[in-house]
């Protein structure tokens, strides 16, 4: 299936701006493989387009590539295109082309161009202000380095600040959008595909699940010749200078280290070093910082892997590397991988349940402001309490408290008693609405509690309805 799938809303908005026939500067950004270029290609398919994909090389070589892109648009039959003497000359040619005719000019991988030619943002600012605002130019700046795009293109310090007319941060698909790729598979299989690929269309296609997730993993993931097996290493080499330390940090977090001190101990580096590398991983969208909902960042801050694909790879590949290399992984897969999938899916199921409440539930007892996890110390029992879901209200003091269980056994009334206790430890609400999500269903006793209006029960299958 096309990587463009589920991007209809973005395409509609891009086309609406194109129909206006006035200058546009659109910024499109998001992590690698998420489908940015596929979206742009779909948008440009029936439009006059100059598509320039910047190279991770010198300014001179990028000017040569830009010259070819412009000349192949102007004179598609010309075998060898002349090179513009300067970037100013190339931009002037684009100005001339867009005076009377609507033209889409795409700079893909814009951070590469800005690195090779640091003055390019100021040059674009000048030509936008003095020439392009009165033209029919439709400029698209696209990039995968999210920190660069947010600070050096969208940020207040950027020469381009205030010049954009629209921006799109292209996110991975959510769990329900991911399932559209495999409408005939079960809810369990689709949840696993989401947990493995993180909703990245390119990875969904490469995993290529047909009848069995297990079979697809063995053929297209746990195989040395497969694309997905090599992908994390290739991405890190492409983005980072010292992948070894980044590897160690990602592996530490994937194995359960979430606090700075725990990560530092596993990696064997000082806090200052780990902190610097973690910041880069956060900028790339691989890791993320989390704080208990309703609280400010501080001592309770933890680090998690934001990218499910990296999380899955680092959870299961390094520990099974010998079996993969020797071709024995199929023999040990049931007890080396499959039996741990429910545990691996725990955090992912929580995110699915949060997204269900935010985007897909038809009727909620409160209007949600935000949703997330909460953790803190129970002062009576002197131990940590963690609540899978806390939904905060737009106004008032009514909260949603939820529990998420990705396991095969039925959940009973004791889980409702437990989250009631958790709500009292949380202690910020006057009233609480309880939700329990379960892959394996519920006991008769808990179903009766739902009939009495004490709790709302939602199965994995319900998430996909």
PLM feature segments, named:
Residues 1-330, 334:
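Phosphate-binding site recognition
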Residues 293, 302-465:
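A cross-kingdom feature that marks ATP-driven nucleic-acid transaction machinery
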């Amino acid at each position: 299936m096309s990587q463009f799938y589920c991007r209809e809303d973005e395409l509609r908005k891009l086309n609406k701006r194109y129909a206006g026939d006035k200058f546009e500067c659109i910024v499109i950004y998001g992590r690698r493989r998420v489908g940015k270029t596929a979206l742009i290609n779909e948008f440009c398919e029936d439009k006059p387009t100059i598509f320039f994909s910047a190279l991770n090389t010198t300014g001179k070589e990028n000017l040569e590539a830009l010259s070819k892109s412009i000349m192949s648009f102007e004179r598609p039959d010309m075998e060898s295109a002349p090179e513009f003497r300067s970037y100013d000359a190339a931009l002037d040619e684009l100005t001339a082309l867009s005076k009377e005719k609507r033209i889409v000019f795409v700079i893909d991988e814009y951070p590469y161009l800005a690195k090779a030619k640091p003055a390019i943002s100021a040059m674009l600012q000048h030509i936008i202000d003095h020439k392009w605002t009165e033209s029919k130019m439709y400029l698209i700046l696209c990039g995968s380095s999210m920190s660069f795009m947010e600070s050096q293109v969208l940020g207040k310090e950027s020469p381009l600040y205030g010049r954009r007319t629209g921006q799109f941060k292209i996110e991975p698909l959510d769990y329900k959008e991911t399932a559209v790729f495999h409408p005939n598979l079960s809810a369990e299989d689709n949840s696993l595909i989401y947990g493995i690929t993180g909703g990245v269309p390119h990875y969904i296609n490469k995993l290529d699940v047909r009848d069995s997730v297990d079979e697809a993993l063995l053929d297209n993931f746990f195989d040395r010749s497969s694309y997905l097996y090599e992908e994390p290493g290739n991405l890190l080499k492409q983005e980072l200078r010292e992948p070894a330390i980044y590897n160690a940090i990602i592996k530490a977090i994937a194995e359960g280290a979430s606090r700075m001190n725990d990560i530092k101990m596993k990696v064997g580096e000082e806090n200052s070093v780990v902190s610097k590398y973690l910041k880069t991983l956060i900028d790339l969208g691989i890791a993320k910082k989390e704080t208990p909902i309703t609280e400010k960042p501080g001592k309770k801050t933890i680090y998690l892997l934001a990218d499910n694909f990296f999380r899955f790879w680092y959870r299961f590949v390094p520990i099974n590397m010998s079996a993969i290399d020797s071709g024995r992984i199929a023999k040990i897969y049931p007890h080396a991988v499959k039996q741990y999938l429910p545990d691996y899916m725990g955090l992912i199921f929580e995110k699915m349940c949060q997204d269900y409440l935010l985007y897909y539930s038809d009727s909620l007892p409160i209007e949600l402001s935000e949703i997330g996890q909460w953790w803190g110390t129970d002062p009576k029992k002197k131990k940590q309490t963690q609540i899978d879901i806390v939904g905060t209200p737009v106004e008032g003091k009514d909260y949603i408290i939820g529990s998420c269980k990705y396991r095969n056994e039925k959940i009973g009334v004791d889980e409702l008693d437990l989250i009631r206790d958790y709500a009292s430890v949380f202690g910020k609400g006057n009233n609480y609405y309880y939700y329990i999500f379960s892959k394996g269903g519920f006991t008769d006793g808990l179903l009766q509690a739902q009939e009495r209006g004490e709790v709302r029960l939602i199965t994995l299958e319900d998430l996909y309805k």
